[in-house]
């Protein structure tokens, strides 16, 4: 497994960023979607990607989760190069996907079980957990996102906000090291948004890491997130443009 050194930690020891992209390029159907993007996310950070539609935010999320592979450049997770060879190792790929929890902007893209309870239990059930630990994780995640009363409901019959909360519960039940969230509050009412915000603040306070995309600077301010702005030319800066507004989002 390839690895790369990172920044100095306590006592001068080398500590790799949890997420690092180095000059990553990705094209789709002859169109360059991500053009030489470099960024880092350290452990315990809450980082927001901002930028206009089409700048590549969603594609960057998919690259980080291993759903896409860069044409050129390097992606490192916890110091290890994530590429086709890495993901062909089924054991390594399974550990990687357990550590990187991804929630799509459209929750329908990741809901596939007959009931909410089965949906939330599916991920941790693949981890070989003892039955009592599996039950505890499912119960806690459903309570956390206030979907416990929907345990026997079909995910397909829920509102958009309920689906989003079920998708979050399903990923969080796996206790990933980092949550990668594509527009996590899109389509949520105020109460559901509060649930998500309070969870994210507590998650990071517990030492976990969050990388999210959003169009809403008010959400970034509320979370105290470090902002990375990607402009329409795919240039990356460490703060959103003062002229950048809060346009409603679409995937890019």
Task: Describe the residue ranges of each PLM region.
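Conserved ABC transporter NBD signature motif
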Residues: 73-85, 96
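Conserved ABC ATPase "signature" region
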Residues: 132-150
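Catalytic Walker B motif of ABC-type/P-loop ATPase nucleotide-binding domains
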Residues: 179-182
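Conserved ABC ATPase signature
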Residues: 154-158, 162
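H-loop/switch region of ABC-family ATPase nucleotide-binding domains
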Residues: 214-215
């Amino acid at each position: 497994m390839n690895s790369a050194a990172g920044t100095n930690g306590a006592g001068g020891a080398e500590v790799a960023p949890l997420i690092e992209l180095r000059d990553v390029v990705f094209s789709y159907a002859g169109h360059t979607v991500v053009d030489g993007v470099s960024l880092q996310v350290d452990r315990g950070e809450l980082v927001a990607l901002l930028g206009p539609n089409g700048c590549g935010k969603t594609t960057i999320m998919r690259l980080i989760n291993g759903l896409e592979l860069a044409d050129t450049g390097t992606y490192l997770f916890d110091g290890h190069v994530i590429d086709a060879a890495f993901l062909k190792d089924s054991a390594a790929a399974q550990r990687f996907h357990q550590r990187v929890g991804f929630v799509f902007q459209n929750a329908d893209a990741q809901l596939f079980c007959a009931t909410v309870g089965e949906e939330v239990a599916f991920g941790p059930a693949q981890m070989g957990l003892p039955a009592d630990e599996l039950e505890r994780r499912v119960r806690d995640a459903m309570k956390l996102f206030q979907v416990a009363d929907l345990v026997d409901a079909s995910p397909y019959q829920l509102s958009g906000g309920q689906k989003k909360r079920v998708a979050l519960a399903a990923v969080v039940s796996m206790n990933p090291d980092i949550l990668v969230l594509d527009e996590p509050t899109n389509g949520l009412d105020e109460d559901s948004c509060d649930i998500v915000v309070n969870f994210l603040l507590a998650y990071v306070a517990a030492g976990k890491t969050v990388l999210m995309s959003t169009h809403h600077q008010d959400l970034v301010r509320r979370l105290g997130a470090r902002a990375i702005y990607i402009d329409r030319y795919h240039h990356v800066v460490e703060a959103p443009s003062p002229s950048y507004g809060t346009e409603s989002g679409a995937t890019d």
